[in-house]
Design a protein with these regions (language model features):
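Conserved acidic donor-binding segment of nucleotide-sugar-dependent glycosyltransferases
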Residues: 308-309, 313-320, 329-334
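Conserved donor-binding/catalytic core segment of Leloir-type glycosyltransferases
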Residues: 195-213, 219-223, 230
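Carbohydrate-associated surface elements
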Residues: 165, 186
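Short hydrophobic beta-strand element within catalytic cores of glycosyltransferases
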Residues: 293-296
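Membrane-proximal helix-turn-helix segments that form the acceptor-binding/catalytic region
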Residues: 100, 113, 125-159, 168
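Short acidic/histidine- and often glycine-rich active-site loop of Leloir-type glycosyltransferases
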Residues: 284, 299-309, 313-314
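A short, well-ordered alpha-helix in the C-terminal region of glycosyltransferases
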Residues: 322, 329, 336-351, 357-363
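Nucleotide-activated donor-binding/catalytic signature segment of Leloir-type glycosyltransferases, i.e.
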Residues: 239-261
Length: 364
C-alpha cells in the first residue's frame, strides 16, 4: 500500500513528532511504501514579512498545494493519506486537495486544538492558558481561523483518537462518533531488565519546560522533598528554571530519545505533572515499557491510561501538597510500587507494543 504522511513539526521536538516517525518505520517494516511530507516552522517564520505571510495563509495555503502537486508527480497517487499536524504551514488545504482527487484521508487527533475553545483549558488559578505561543490574544485569533476551517473536516474518512476520553470529547463537540476510532500510541518492545525501585536513584521529568506541563508545581514540590530530580527537555521556561539553581534538580536540556530512555530506565519514578489536557503522552508509555513507576496528574486522558495504584499513581493537578504526599508514599511503599510498575509493563506488552498497534492501524 502507498501511504502519504502529512505533518508539521513543532518548534520543540515532542511526542507527536516521535509518533509520526515511529509509525512510518512500522509501516515500512511491513512492506508499505511511505512518503513523509514534513514541513517545519523554520521554513518561513524568519522575517516579519515571512511571519505575516504564514499568518495570512493560515486557513488555506497555496504553497502547500504547490508542494503536494510536485510530490504527487514524483510519488504518484497514494492509496491513502494519513494527516497528523497541519498547523501552521500545511493548513486544512491538504484535505481539500486530496478530496478532489478522491483519495481517502485519515487524521490522527494528537491534541485538542480543534476544541480548545470548547474545553476551556485553565490552570489551577483559573487563568486560561494561551495555547498559541502562550498568548491569549494569539490563541483567540487562531481559534477563529480554526473554526472557519472545520467544514473541511467532512473530507476526512476516519479520525484516530488515543483514548476513550479523547473520543468522547471530540464526539461531544465537533466530530460524529461514527467517524472516530481509538488507537493508542505505541513503542517497540525492549529486553531491558526491570529493576526494583530500591535499586534506582533519582526521579525524572521528561517533557517541555513550560507552565502548562506543570514544571512550576514540580519545582515547588521538589524543593521540599529529599530526592534528586533529573529534568529532561527544553521550553519557554528553561532559562527561568535554570536561574533558580535548585540543588536537587538538574536540568539536562533536550536529549536524543535513546538517552531519554536510559534515564527513564534507571529512575525510581517518572513525574508527569501536566496541568492541561494531554492526548497520549509518549513519556508515560516509555516508562511503562521500561518498568518505571509513573506519578502523573489526574487530568484528561491520563485518567484513561492510568488506574490509580494499579499501573501508576495519580495526584491532583497543580496541587503541590498532594504531589509531595504522593512522592513520600512512593518512597515509603517501594514493594507495592514495584508491583504497580510491573502491572504497567504487562499492560504495555498487551496493549501498546508495535506488533499490537500495527494491526490496529491497518484496521482503521
Amino acid at each position: 500500500m502507498k501511504i502519504i504522511q502529512i505533518h508539521n513539526k513543532y518548534r520543540y521536538f515532542g511526542g507527536e513528532d516521535s509518533v509520526v516517525d515511529e509509525e512510518a518505520k512500522l509501516l515500512s517494516s511491513n512492506n508499505h511504501e511511505v512518503n513523509q511530507l514534513i514541513r517545519d516552522n523554520s521554513e518561513e517564520l524568519i522575517s516579519f514579512q515571512d511571519k505575516f505571510n504564514a499568518f495570512k495563509n493560515i486557513s488555506y495555503s497555496f504553497r502547500s498545494v504547490e508542494i503536494l502537486n510536485k510530490e504527487l508527480l514524483k510519488f504518484g497517487n497514494p492509496d491513502i493519506v494519513h494527516v497528523h499536524n497541519t498547523f501552521p504551514l500545511w493548513t486544512y488545504s491538504v484535505f481539500d486537495f486530496f478530496k478532489k482527487k478522491n483519495i481517502p484521508i485519515i487524521m490522527t487527533l494528537h491534541n485538542y486544538r480543534l476544541i480548545w475553545e470548547k474545553l476551556g483549558l485553565f490552570n489551577k488559578d483559573r487563568e486560561k492558558y494561551g495555547y498559541f505561543k502562550d498568548s491569549n490574544i494569539g490563541s483567540f485569533i487562531i481559534s477563529k481561523f480554526i473554526n472557519k476551517q472545520k467544514n473541511l473536516l467532512k473530507n476526512v474518512s476516519k479520525f484516530i483518537t488515543h483514548t476513550e476520553f479523547t473520543k468522547y470529547e471530540f464526539s461531544k463537540h465537533v466530530i460524529p462518533e461514527n467517524k472516530l476510532v481509538i488507537k493508542p500510541n505505541f513503542l517497540n518492545s525492549t529486553n531491558n531488565k526491570i529493576q526494583s525501585i530500591s535499586e534506582k536513584n533519582n526521579a525524572i521529568f521528561a517533557s517541555r519546560i513550560s507552565k502548562e506541563k506543570g514544571i512550576l508545581t514540580l519545582i515547588k514540590a521538589f524543593t521540599k522533598i529529599d530526592i534528586n530530580l533529573d529534568a529532561l527537555g527544553d521550553g519557554p521556561l528553561f532559562k527561568k528554571v535554570k536561574k533558580y539553581n535548585i540543588n536537587n534538580i538538574k536540568l539536562h536540556g533536550n536529549l536524543p530519545r535513546d538517552k531519554v530512555n536510559k534515564f527513564i530506565n534507571k529512575s525510581k519514578f517518572l513525574v508527569f505533572p501536566s496541568e492541561w489536557y494531554e492526548s497520549f503522552p509518549m513519556t508515560i508509555l516509555e516508562a511503562f515499557r521500561e518498568g518505571t513507576l509513573v506519578l502523573a496528574s489526574n487530568i484528561g486522558s491520563i485518567k484513561s491510561i492510568i488506574k490509580d495504584r494499579f499501573n501508576g499513581i495519580l495526584f491532583e493537578p497543580g496541587n503541590t501538597s498532594d504531589l509531595i504526599d504522593k512522592v513520600k508514599w512512593i518512597l515509603n511503599n517501594q514493594r507495592e510500587c514495584d508491583q504497580i510498575a510491573l502491572n504497567a509493563n504487562n499492560e504495555f506488552n498487551q496493549k501498546y507494543s508495535s506488533e499490537v498497534n500495527y494491526k490496529q492501524l491497518i484496521d482503521v
